[in-house]
């Protein structure tokens, strides 16, 4: 699994002109599922997102997690984070899990994340989404297992 994680002031997902999810301060995670990902990867990524210290203390040091600051997490499935651009001009997505497998793993990941005592919202799997992100910092990290 791979997640592009951004600290945000707010985030919103719109599908077909309808807002389906919206958060205030917290994290937006664009999550890709790789072939072979399962329970272990879901648990690792959920724990990492909730406890990742990328929120600043009073001295400007990254000492707080989204859980510590009472923030929310908006999770968006996104197979393109597994785009391999090393050859040619068109990304290859052969590492990404096929949709029927990825959907099951993504839903399990959301279930585990929702057990973590933090507000979790998500986009719609395999939908064409408009994702509005107001990045805070900007702070953007990649988490991979």
Curated annotation (Swiss-Prot):
GO terms (BP aspect): D-amino acid catabolic process
GO cellular component, one term: cytoplasm
Matching Gene3D superfamilies: D-tyrosyl-tRNA(Tyr) deacylase
Keywords on record: Cytoplasm, Hydrolase, RNA-binding, tRNA-binding
Catalytic activity: glycyl-tRNA(Ala) + H2O = tRNA(Ala) + glycine + H(+); a D-aminoacyl-tRNA + H2O = a tRNA + a D-alpha-amino acid + H(+)
Any GO MF annotation of the entry: Gly-tRNA(Ala) deacylase activity
Subcellular location: Cytoplasm
Motif (Gly-cisPro motif, important for rejection of L-amino acids): 137-138
Main location, first listed in the record: cytoplasm
Family: Belongs to the DTD family.
Functional note: An aminoacyl-tRNA editing enzyme that deacylates mischarged D-aminoacyl-tRNAs. Also deacylates mischarged glycyl-tRNA(Ala), protecting cells against glycine mischarging by AlaRS. Acts via tRNA-based rather than protein-based catalysis; rejects L-amino acids rather than detecting D-amino acids in the active site. By recycling D-aminoacyl-tRNA to D-amino acids and free tRNA molecules, this enzyme counteracts the toxicity associated with the formation of D-aminoacyl-tRNA entities in vivo and helps enforce protein L-homochirality.
Domain commentary: A Gly-cisPro motif from one monomer fits into the active site of the other monomer to allow specific chiral rejection of L-amino acids.
Record note on quaternary structure: Homodimer.
Listed name of the protein: D-aminoacyl-tRNA deacylase
Organism: Carboxydothermus hydrogenoformans (strain ATCC BAA-161 / DSM 6008 / Z-2901)
């Amino acid at each position: 699994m791979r997640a592009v994680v951004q600290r945000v002031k707010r985030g919103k997902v719109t599908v077909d002109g309808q807002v389906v999810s919206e958060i205030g301060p917290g994290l937006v995670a664009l999550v890709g599922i790789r072939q072979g990902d399962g329970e272990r990867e879901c648990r690792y990524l959920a724990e990492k997102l909730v406890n990742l210290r990328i929120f600043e203390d009073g001295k400007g040091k990254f000492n707080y997690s989204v859980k510590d600051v009472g923030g929310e997490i908006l999770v968006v499935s996104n197979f393109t984070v597994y785009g391999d651009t090393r050859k040619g001009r068109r990304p290859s997505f052969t590492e990404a899990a096929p949709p029927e497998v990825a959907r099951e793993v993504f839903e399990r990941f959301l279930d585990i994340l929702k057990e973590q005592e933090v507000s979790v919202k998500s986009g719609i799997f395999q939908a064409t989404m408009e994702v509005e992100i107001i990045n805070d910092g900007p702070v953007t990290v990649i988490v991979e297992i």
